[in-house]
Amino acid sequence: MKHRTFFSLCAKFGCLLALGACSPKIVDAGTATVPHTLSTLKTADNRPASVYLKKDKPTLIKFWASWCPLCLSELGQAEKWAQDAKFSSANLITVASPGFLHEKKDGEFQKWYAGLNYPKLPVVTDNGGTIAQNLNISVYPSWALIGKDGDVQRIVKGSINEAQALALIRNPNADLGSLKHSFYKPDTQKKDSAIMNTRTIYLAGGCFWGLEAYFQRIDGVVDAVSGYANGNTENPSYEDVSYRHTGHAETVKVTYDADKLSLDDILQYYFRVVDPTSLNKQGNDTGTQYRSGVYYTDPAEKAVIAAALKREQQKYQLPLVVENEPLKNFYDAEEYHQDYLIKNPNGYCHIDIRKADEPLPGKTKAAPQGKGFDAATYKKPSDAELKRTLTEEQYQVTQNSATEYAFSHEYDHLFKPGIYVDVVSGEPLFSSADKYDSGCGWPSFTRPIDAKSVTEHDDFSFNMRRTEVRSRAADSHLGHVFPDGPRDKGGLRYCINGASLKFIPLEQMDAAGYGALKGEVK
């Protein structure tokens, strides 16, 4: 697999195809010039970045932005790591990109950061975000591991904990998914997370690159790993599976939160992106390794899969050829296959992964069913009830003012007609008629349905003055309101955590008790 040279003055970028990978899609590779390297940049306090870059060490970079509350909450942690002897085997720096991806302009950012108190945190400023753009960084926080020779070895999008960071430095191919990841909440002491009720199913449906990326986007999916299943040999390589007739199928191991998704839900998502009538072929990929199949480890799941197949058969005249079999074996694919479309955004993908952002028919996945709120009075349940019925993320966001990852929630991309209610109490808050794509990474609205349904509070954290927004009835933390919204609609942007909301589709509003508000949607 080719690596991208980072410390050179010029690097070429494009579709990076691993040896013997899934059938390639022809794309224009193109080129991109990197006018500045890390060593030529300066830090926020005007020091040469080269001070922090020793050539005989790999470099672990954290990309962050001033508008990302999660990033801000982790600055102290990053400063601690930068001084910790455990991280001495690598250069550890952070990069901010003034003028890129909604970041403040250079002078404004410098002035803002000067008011913070992280004297030992290396913050390199890359004006215009050249480095972030060339590495396809579009989500904050994100991490990149650069080898001693300047090769990009790994890109991780999202927050990582100390154990994951150290594992990454020791081994760029480390399985970060096997390490504990705690949800971080700002300005409060971290508490232990509840044990998640997870289950696993194994899905084969053509090239695993696309299927893995697709399931990773689905709310409630904990992990998706590419591998080889139900073959005749042990520990096969990609070349074995492709050319030596081992009988394995390219398969994605999907681990999901059973309190948020059922197996039938997973199968509905699966059938959205595979042709169940195509024998040994999906997209451009042909061969028995590209067959379709659902492989289970719990015999009770066979009937659930059979029922889903029977339902799906009604949509087709041709017979379905999807296998419904017990899992005989599964072996993780090589590291270069894992997260392939994150490492190589222009790589081949035979499915439309955006379908992961579309809720299932009749489903509103942000909140478990049967939450038990009082729709008439919008009462807040007890804390014990909230811990039982909300997900860990929903609880931390609404009760402890935590912040979900930017661009992580399905509601950021949802624009179907309906209303958004408080996930805690059910109180109506926002309408789809007032929702717009602000590009900030969180669901954005120009106004609440009723101005009295939200309360505003001064928030002076992180050397900024912001206006926090909370729900009236349950006092749930929702997000913040900013004066940079569409001028023709009042000029406000309500930037709201998707985890604080529950979406009620227009066609379900009557049954859910919100029929009187349908006029706010139409």
Curated annotation (Swiss-Prot):
Molecular function as annotated in GO: L-methionine-(S)-S-oxide reductase activity; peptide-methionine (R)-S-oxide reductase activity; peptide-methionine (S)-S-oxide reductase activity
Catalytically driven reaction(s): L-methionyl-[protein] + [thioredoxin]-disulfide + H2O = L-methionyl-(S)-S-oxide-[protein] + [thioredoxin]-dithiol; [thioredoxin]-disulfide + L-methionine + H2O = L-methionine (S)-S-oxide + [thioredoxin]-dithiol; L-methionyl-[protein] + [thioredoxin]-disulfide + H2O = L-methionyl-(R)-S-oxide-[protein] + [thioredoxin]-dithiol
E.C. number: 1.8.4.11, 1.8.4.12
Entry-linked PROSITE patterns: MSRB (PS51790), THIOREDOXIN_2 (PS51352)
Biological-process GO terms, alphabetical: cellular response to oxidative stress; protein modification process
Catalytic residues, chain numbering: 207, 495
Stretch list, region Peptide methionine sulfoxide reductase A: 199-354
Pfam family, one: Redoxin
Entry keyword set: Disulfide bond, Electron transport, Multifunctional enzyme, Oxidoreductase, Redox-active center, Transport
Signal peptide (UniProt feature, chain positions): none
Cited InterPro entries: Met_Sox_Rdtase_MsrA_dom, Met_Sox_Rdtase_MsrA_sf, Met_Sox_Rdtase_MsrB_dom, MsrA_MetSO_reductase, Mss4-like_sf, Redoxin, Thioredoxin-like_sf, Thioredoxin_domain
Cellular component terms per the entry's GO annotation: cytoplasm
Reported consequences of knocking out the gene: Hyperpiliated and hyperadherent.
Domain MsrB: 383-506
Keyword Cytoplasm appears in the UniProt entry: no
Major enzyme class: oxidoreductase
Thioredoxin domain boundaries: 17-174
Cysteine pairings via disulfide bonds: 68-71, 440-495
HAMAP family: MsrA, MsrB
Function field: Has an important function as a repair enzyme for proteins that have been inactivated by oxidation. Catalyzes the reversible oxidation-reduction of methionine sulfoxide in proteins to methionine.
UniProt record similarity statement: In the N-terminal section; belongs to the thioredoxin family.
Domain notes: Possesses 2 methionine sulfoxide reductase domains (A/MsrA and B/MsrB) and 1 N-terminal thioredoxin domain. The domain B exhibits a thioredoxin dependent methionine sulfoxide reductase activity; the Cys-495 is probably involved in the reduction of MetSO and in formation of the sulfenic acid derivative. The regeneration of Cys-495 is probably done via formation of a disulfide bond with Cys-440 followed by its reduction by thioredoxin.
Protein name, as recorded: Peptide methionine sulfoxide reductase MsrA/MsrB
Organism, scientific name: Neisseria gonorrhoeae
